Amino acid sequence: MYWDVKKVAPLPDYRIYVEIMDGRRGIFDLKPYLDHGTLRELRDENYFKQVGIVFGAVTWPHDQDIAPETLIAEMTPVDDQPEDSFLRIVEHGA
């Protein structure tokens, strides 16, 4: 679907960079979720970095996920920044 996630990358401080199929890009902060249920496991930074995409949703190996609708509603858009600057953030974890 048009709101599926097409790219995700871990960032410092429990944030992720996401790109949505419709072209939106943003930074999603997971800190508010880290004390809830199965998402507690994401506090392990090495595990957090194993983020991926399954069926258009952001996921981790033990079945934690963030729905695209939640990402879109709560992410901080980065559309006003050049794409290459965010590629550097993703590649270098700055």
Q: Where are these predicted regions, by residue range?
A:
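Motif-centric detector for short Cys/His coordination patterns
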Residues: 1-94
